[in-house]
Amino acid sequence: MVSMHIPVLYDAALAALNLRPDGRYIDGTLGWAGHSSGILEGSGPTGRLLAIDQDPMALAAARERLAPYGERATIVHGNYRQMASLAAQHGWQQVDGILLDIGVSSPQLDLPERGFSFQYDAPLDMRMNPTRGESAADLIAQLDETSLANLIYEYGEERLSRRIARRIVEQRSKSPITSTAQLASLVKSAVGGQAGKTHPATRTFQALRIAVNDELGALREGLAAATNLLAPGGRLAVITFHSLEDRIVKEWMRDQASECLIPAKLEILACPHNCAANTGPRSCIYPVGRDCDYVPTLEVLSRKPIEATPEELKANPRARSAKLRVAERRLTKTLAS
């Protein structure tokens, strides 16, 4: 049974965007349009929204939900990492706010055929866009044991990754691993069925989902695209659900808000910014006495992540790991690298 999708941190996210009546906004992760409908309500009657999602099923549901807003809502099929080109296709050069709600939605988790959850026995898929790319079953059939262990460790932060990878490789030599229940059982047997609130397969499923959809790569590209699209004073609000995502967002906002600390007295020094003195991908060459010309692009508005209130957690337990970080575009024309 598919649960009703309740958008997490709804009030906090809309407040973070600082909505205004004539603004232009992007929801890079449209989903079932919970946040999008709030953006349109808060920016009415002339505010516009470009809503992006890669899941055809979510798009169908969102189109129905946003139909009352007419031409104020433009819905496109794509990945938010492509938002710069998608915005340009619709004549948008700058926007007043961008929302990214990273990760898998409740309906995706609750539909067995999508293969995201170990709660059901279903095909091992995990693709956000089920019409493109390799499934999780394809991935674990192709990777060697070391690569599989590294993937589970890096993306799932699973300390028993080598044991799990070894068990998967042993099983696939006998028969293909094609279902969620089959994989969950293998992981549980590999780690010894350790007791606890979290299912033993949780981290492995997370790791495979992230890899199948290149979620961290999309996040990095999406943050860069979003920063460049924001008009001065525009807001970027990003909701994450696990430490890997949150770390990327935190570091991106921090780096884009930081002054360059390259001292003028040094002639050659590695520089993290794409300044005019940059002569290669890894270093800037400075004449003596010249500073890096990088100008910060963002101001971080949330020094600590915003989390769900006790009231929201009671209504929506899946919001327990959600974190919202917010930044504002500085009044400068210098674009982020």
From Swiss-Prot:
Transmembrane segments: none annotated. Disulfide bonds: none annotated. Pfam families: Methyltransf_5. Keywords: Cytoplasm, Methyltransferase, rRNA processing, S-adenosyl-L-methionine, Transferase. GO terms for biological process: rRNA base methylation. The keyword rRNA processing applies. GO terms for cellular component: cytoplasm. It is found in: Cytoplasm. S-adenosyl-L-methionine binds at A33, G34, H35, D53, D101, Q108. It catalyses: cytidine(1402) in 16S rRNA + S-adenosyl-L-methionine = N(4)-methylcytidine(1402) in 16S rRNA + S-adenosyl-L-homocysteine + H(+). GO terms for molecular function: rRNA (cytosine-N4-)-methyltransferase activity. Its EC number is 2.1.1.199. InterPro entries: RsmH, SAM-dep_MeTrfase_MraW_recog, SAM-dependent_MTases_sf. It comes from the Bacteria. The keyword rRNA processing applies. Belongs to the methyltransferase superfamily. RsmH family. NCBIfam families: 16S rRNA (cytosine(1402)-N(4))-methyltransferase RsmH. PANTHER family: 12S RRNA N4-METHYLCYTIDINE METHYLTRANSFERASE (PTHR11265:SF0), S-ADENOSYL-METHYLTRANSFERASE MRAW (PTHR11265). HAMAP family: 16SrRNA_methyltr_H. Specifically methylates the N4 position of cytidine in position 1402 (C1402) of 16S rRNA. This is Ribosomal RNA small subunit methyltransferase H. It comes from Herpetosiphon aurantiacus (strain ATCC 23779 / DSM 785 / 114-95). The gene is rsmH.
